[in-house]
Amino acid sequence: MDLWNWDEASPQEVPPGNKLAGLEGAKLGFCFPDLALQGDTPTATAETCWKGTSSSLASFPQLDWGSALLHPEVPWGAEPDSQALPWSGDWTDMACTAWDSWSGASQTLGPAPLGPGPIPAAGSEGAAGQNCVPVAGEATSWSRAQAAGSNTSWDCSVGPDGDTYWGSGLGGEPRTDCTISWGGPAGPDCTTSWNPGLHAGGTTSLKRYQSSALTVCSEPSPQSDRASLARCPKTNHRGPIQLWQFLLELLHDGARSSCIRWTGNSREFQLCDPKEVARLWGERKRKPGMNYEKLSRGLRYYYRRDIVRKSGGRKYTYRFGGRVPSLAYPDCAGGGRGAETQ
């Protein structure tokens, strides 16, 4: 049995260009220099090589050498391009580079890893940070820090001081809810909400809801007197209607022939139902206490003005005077319309 003599053994050398791919916990894409071992030094191990080269990397930034697996075209002994170095973190926030790029956990080919920064919660101020993640076939690509397969939802709220606050969170469906309140012509309780939702087809639906404290004033229902007198033709007069004008309206209305009618003797007319005529006149003037005695006093006022005169021979019979414009009246005796008189 031959004994191994350490003094006679040739020094062990690390082969040049070795990537040490078999070392677990380190993925180094650069070459190691040839290290000559002393005669009394045992075989070089990964720990010895690590200690020998880690001091030379102190001046370099923390690089994600594990992401080099996504670039199969890079040769084993080639130095990585300084412009295509995949930095993990936000370029504007160097604090995000604290991610341990020398992690011992092995990485597998798949989706790009998430950035080290925390995912911005809904309601946080400012825009969400961006991460530079290497993609196969490209140098770098920028993407927002969000979970794979999920969408981003933005919430907009307007505070009492008028400032607008935007926040992003993770949700199943993109949504944007914006509620604005103001005190305008519609009152302080007027609120308008917009809810535009994004559907899978790329279409946008906008829903607007508006509530107001305004009260709607309904039109007052017409009085019974106006409804009953709406069928009467109006005479051409200005100002408030007078009694003789109202009597002409009733005479021109065939539906009122039971209470007032022409006698056929020139401009003479007769009150067949004086109480009904007085009631209609009271409804028109909004005087519910109107009666025939008050109406007759108004007719006597027209006597000396030659507008209405008392016609003798019949009770409740009157005649229009010469001051009344020419009018046509039906000739009851002849069954037709009489001639115009002055």
From Swiss-Prot:
User: What is any Pfam family matched here?
Assistant: Ets
SUPFAM superfamilies given in the database record = Winged helix' DNA-binding domain
GO CC annotation? nucleus
Q: Which domain of life is it from?
A: Eukaryota
Could you tell me which residues form the DNA-binding region? 240-320
Which GO molecular function entries does the Swiss-Prot or TrEMBL record give?
DNA-binding transcription activator activity, RNA polymerase II-specific; DNA-binding transcription factor activity, RNA polymerase II-specific; RNA polymerase II cis-regulatory region sequence-specific DNA binding; sequence-specific double-stranded DNA binding
User: Which cysteines share a disulfide bond?
Assistant: none
List the subcellular locations. Answer: Nucleus
A Gene Ontology biological process in which this protein takes part is:
blastocyst development
Q: Which Gene3D superfamilies match?
A: Winged helix-like DNA-binding domain superfamily/Winged helix DNA-binding domain (1.10.10.10)
Keywords attached to this Swiss-Prot or TrEMBL record, sorted alphabetically, are: DNA-binding, Nucleus
Q: What is its main location?
A: nucleus
Q: What is the protein's known function?
A: Binds to DNA sequences containing the consensus pentanucleotide 5'-CGGA[AT]-3'.
Q: Which family does it belong to?
A: Belongs to the ETS family.
User: What is the official name of this protein in its record?
Assistant: ETS translocation variant 2
Q: Name the source organism.
A: Homo sapiens
Q: Which gene encodes it?
A: ETV2
